[in-house]
Amino acid sequence: MSIFNMITSYAGSQLLPFYIAIFVFTLVPWAIRFSWLELRKGSVVPLANPPDSLFGTGKTRRSFVKLSREILAKARSLFPNEPFRLITDWDFADEIRNDPRLSFSKAAMQDNHAGIPGFETVALVGREDQLIQKVARKQLTKHLYIIARISSRIYLGDQLCRNEAWLKITKTYTTNFYTASTNLRMFPRSIRPLAHWFLPECRKLRQERKDAIGIITPLIERRRELRRAAIAAGQPLPVFHDAIDWSEQEAEAAGTGASFDPVIFQLTLSLLAIHTTYDLLQQTMIDLGRHPEYIEPLRQEVVQLLREEGWKKTTLFKMKLLDSAIKESQRMKPGSIVTMRRYVTEDITLSSGLTLKKGTRLNVDNRRLDDPKIYDNPEVYNPYRFYDMRSEAGKDHGAQLVSTGSNHMGFGHGQHSCPGRFFAANEIKVALCHILVKYDWKLCPDTETKPDTRGMIAKSSPVTDILIKRRESVELDLEAI
């Protein structure tokens, strides 16, 4: 499909002939020129899926969305043990993981159209004060004692965590964001500032941001009024233990409060945390549904530790089999088929002699997760894999769910590894504790369990049918602990 047809298919009769003429005679040649120059960057590295012609990469991009696993597998066989554009072999993971010249935030902002209305959330990742990273590392991790509460309770407090309008936004915004981002990426970068106005998914993002402002802003104003009243009365300032308060504190401490948008911050938390946490929880349930013989040992571990120690962070840490089962599900189905997304901010020469030019984009291949040289029988789900690894000398730390390394980059690797992984890991454990103790489940016969891979992103199957029922008798009353 040509660029012209792509635009008109979205815009239909709304696109006036005047704008069509401008588009055809000015933007199309401009887009072709810049798309071709972009392809030629870093051409010393072989291109795994070259375009069919000079007149755009739309067909190639759409093909990659549907066939990314196949294209990646072909590239591995064509270029064994060497980089191919723009995905490096995993041998370079440790070398590049903490290099400050390789920017994760710039790569994320470029991929997800920072600066285009509706995509404001991705710009938060690139803030110089690292606001969202600080809140994730310092505050979410510190407040694991209330992990049994759902994410919205921690993020927004008790006033909004049950707000149906907000919960709807948190569920739909992430889906709409990635759909809009993927569809907009089908267009050459040079015309995306125009194309987004005609994409229905982008319109949804702009509307959801407007709706979120209407929900969150009144709450923030009420809190500020309470603080002003407390100051006037000479009383202590009220404290709210949620991400709204934490983010404002961090922004003020960094001296960036004036540029801080609390609504965008909340949408970004939802974007970065909720869907990934849900996906790993769902994949773990699917894997255990396929292997129900492992459910009872996990249940026994949970019941024993909670009965002896109650709900504490140390209790969750001691659930080593549960930790291993989740990490094994992440190994078999990571959230992305590649990891360590980076943008090169200045020329870099790797130890192999390969030079990465400024402006180059790269990712690291995630194939070590199913490499038989690293893991025995990698195609087999074994929830004891990392549990047993903990007893091996020098491997205890690396076998933990939250640990990162070049052999398991489910949460990334290096200084840009997921800052909220400690929070997410414990949130998933608490959810599974409740599910294991209170419910039995199994997969429906012949249900589909194959992951849904779109481009780089791999999601747990959205069509898997799970039969679940409440257990008639339970070993422990979790609410009474």
From Swiss-Prot:
PANTHER family given in the database record? CYTOCHROME P450, CYTOCHROME P450 MONOOXYGENASE AUSG-RELATED
Any one Gene Ontology MF annotation carried by this entry is: heme binding
According to UniProt, the name of this protein is Cytochrome P450 monooygenase 2
State its cofactor.
heme
**According to its UniProt record, which protein family does this protein belong to?**
Belongs to the cytochrome P450 family.
- Null allele phenotype: Leads to the loss of gibberellins production. Accumulates GA14 but later intermediates of the pathway are not detected.
Q: What organism is the protein native to? A: Gibberella fujikuroi (strain CBS 195.34 / IMI 58289 / NRRL A-6831) (Bakanae and foot rot disease fungus)
Function summary: Gibberellin 20-oxidase; part of the gene cluster that mediates the biosynthesis of gibberellins (GAs), diterpenoids that may provide a selective advantage during infection of the preferred host plant, rice. Gibberellins (GAs) are diterpenoids and are synthesized via the mevalonate pathway. Biosynthesis of the major metabolite GA3 (gibberellic acid) from geranylgeranyl diphosphate (GGPP) requires 13 steps.
Q: Which GO terms fall under biological process for this protein?
A: gibberellin biosynthetic process; secondary metabolic process
Q: State its location(s).
A: Membrane
Q: Has UniProt tagged this entry with the keyword Flavoprotein?
A: no
InterPro entries attached to this UniProt entry: Cyt_P450, Cyt_P450_CS, Cyt_P450_E_grp-IV, Cyt_P450_sf
Cellular-component GO terms for this entry = membrane
Q: Which CDD domains did the record assign? A: CYP503A1-like
Q: Note the Pfam families from the entry.
A: p450
What topology does it adopt in the membrane?
Answer: Single-pass membrane protein
Q: What is its main location?
A: membrane
UniProt keyword list: Heme, Iron, Membrane, Metal-binding, Monooxygenase, Oxidoreductase, Transmembrane, Transmembrane helix
Report the transmembrane regions from the record. 12-32
Q: In which pathway does it act?
A: Plant hormone biosynthesis; gibberellin biosynthesis
Expression triggers = Expression is induced under gibberellin-producing conditions. Expression is repressed by high amounts of nitrogen but is not affected by the presence of biosynthetically advanced GAs.
Q: Which domain of life is it from?
A: Eukaryota
State its Enzyme Commission number(s). 1.-.-.-
Q: Which PROSITE patterns match?
A: CYTOCHROME_P450
Please tell me whether the keyword Plastid is annotated for this protein.
no
Q: What class of enzyme is it?
A: oxidoreductase
